[in-house]
Each structure stands twice: as C-alpha cells, then as structure tokens.
C-alpha cells in the first residue's frame, strides 16, 4: 500500500489517495519516516531484520535441509537467544522449509539362501556404550543418466558417525569391502575391545572375502534377515537421511562421479556439523569427542592434584 501511494502521490496527493484506500495519512507518514530513520522502527522489527539474516544463513550453510527445529537449535548453539516460534515465523516469511523424508525403506538386499547365516547378535537393539562397540553396514542405489550407482556405508552405532563409505557403478562384493576397509583405516586398533559388525543377509556381506576380512580384523559378525528394515534400522535411518538430503534434493544425477563428490561433501557435513536429535542435537563427531573427554577427565584431575 505504501508503494502504491508513493507511485501516485505526485499526481493525486497523499491525503486524497488515503481517503479511498484503507490507510490513514499518519500511518503512511510514519512508515516513510521509519524508512529514513531505521532506529524509529519497533524493536521487534529491528530484531527480526537481524535474525532474518542469521536464519537464512544457517539454513543455507546446512545444505537447505534443516527445518524450523534444527535451525532454531543451531542458532541456540551459536548463542542466539531466540524462540522457536520466532524462527518458524521468519522461515515462513522467507519461504524456507526443511527436507521432508519420503519412503524410508527400499529393498537393495540380494540374499543367498545357500550361504550359512551367522546369528543375529543385535536383535534390533541398536545401542552402544562406547565407540567401536557396534558397527552397522548397508548399501543403497541411486538412479543416474548412465545407469544405477551404488553407495555402501559403515556406521558406528554409538555416535551414528559414518566411519566408512564407498560409491561404485557395480553392485559387487568389493563395494561393501571397500567401505569396510575405509572404516578399518579410519579406526585403527578396533580389535582392542570387542566389536560387532551387523548387516543384513546381502551376498556382499556374506561373501568369503568380506567374512575373512572381518575375522582378520577381530570383528564379530552379526546378520539380520533379508529385506527387513527393522533388522538393520539404524543403517536404514542414515541411508534415509542421505537419500532425502542429497539424492532427492539435488538430482537428477549424471553418473558415478557426481554421486561420489556429493556423498563426500555430505558425509563430511553429516559427521562434523549435522545436528542429530537422538544425540541431543549435537553432531556425531562432537558426541564422540565428548565421550573421549569424559574418559580422560579423571586422569587430568589426578595430574592437577
């Protein structure tokens, strides 16, 4: 309305226009005065202007996947004293929204009934008291212009940190094995304490080479059923985030190189920056570091005393 009056005031005058539109001349003049002197604007308007910049920054810095709750949590972590309802109001004004997860489970497992299956040591209890106590592994596929691309993950249950991953244009046993090798490289000395590796009954995870590598590393095997998302729920959950936050939002994909680069960036962000609700809205790396800090704290106190 103010813009309309600005456009026609030279021809008709402010008061005559206000006589036929739903705005008083005093309101118009006050708004124009605030444009010339921003300090005259209400405190809420000035605060909204400053917060709007930060809300949009957080949303964009986190790959445009955060909804109201996580944008609010991130702002609070950064020291902004802001209410969740305020963040929601500003995001609606900006037209910002978080990623919405679709169907969480897609069957990618090809089971081999002829291969003996190790016992299920997890029984759907995806909990761990320390890092390197329980790893879960799974894979998914991505449709590209050049055919399907496959992505394998190895995840530490304690912090939900992705410790190994690999992208390939072939659903071969080496795909899962390469992800495992990356995890073992990232976590040297895992055999120092008992570690269980849990997967579904996919042929990649029951292959002789994969089985031998686990045994060589001193890792105990656990296998759920085939095609049952609940038997590998944590891996399915992380893969669901990957598909929602990367694959569906940034496609279509040209080929394996594009998927690999995007996965590299997402895994780094997920491990170091993404807030996870089950961890108390802290990133996996921070949650894990807090565990190690607690383990060393008594020794530090003893030295000081």
Cite the ranges covered by each PLM segment.
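Charged DNA-binding/catalytic regions of mobile-element recombinases
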Residues: 1-305
């Amino acid at each position: 309305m103010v813009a309309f009056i600005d456009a026609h005031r030279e021809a008709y005058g402010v008061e005559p226009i206000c006589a036929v539109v739903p705005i008083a001349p005093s309101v118009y003049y006050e708004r124009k005065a605030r444009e010339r002197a921003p300090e005259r604007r209400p405190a809420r308007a000035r605060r909204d202007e400053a917060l709007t910049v930060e809300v949009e920054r957080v949303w964009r810095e986190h790959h445009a996947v955060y909804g109201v709750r996580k944008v609010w949590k991130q702002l609070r972590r950064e020291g902004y004293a802001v209410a969740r309802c305020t963040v929601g109001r500003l995001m609606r004004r900006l037209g910002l929204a978080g990623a919405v997860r679709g169907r969480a489970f897609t069957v990618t497992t090809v089971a081999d009934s002829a291969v003996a299956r190790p016992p299920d040591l997890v029984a759907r209890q995806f909990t761990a008291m320390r890092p390197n106590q329980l790893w879960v592994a799974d894979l998914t596929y991505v449709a590209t212009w050049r055919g399907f691309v496959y992505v394998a993950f190895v995840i530490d249950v304690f912090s939900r940190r992705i410790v190994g991953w690999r992208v390939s244009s072939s659903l071969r046993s080496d795909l899962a094995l390469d992800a495992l090798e990356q995890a073992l490289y990232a976590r040297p000395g895992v055999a120092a304490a008992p570690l269980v590796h849990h997967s579904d009954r996919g042929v990649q995870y029951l292959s002789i080479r994969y089985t031998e590598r686990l045994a060589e590393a001193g890792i105990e095997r656990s296998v759920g059923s085939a095609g049952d998302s609940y038997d590998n729920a944590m891996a399915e959950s992380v893969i669901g985030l990957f598909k929602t936050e990367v694959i569906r939002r940034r496609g279509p994909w040209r080929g394996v190189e594009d998927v690999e680069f995007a996965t590299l960036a997402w895994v780094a962000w997920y491990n170091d920056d993404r807030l996870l609700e089950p961890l108390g809205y802290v990133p996996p790396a921070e949650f894990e570091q807090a565990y190690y800090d607690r383990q060393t704290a008594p020794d530090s106190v003893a030295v000081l005393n």
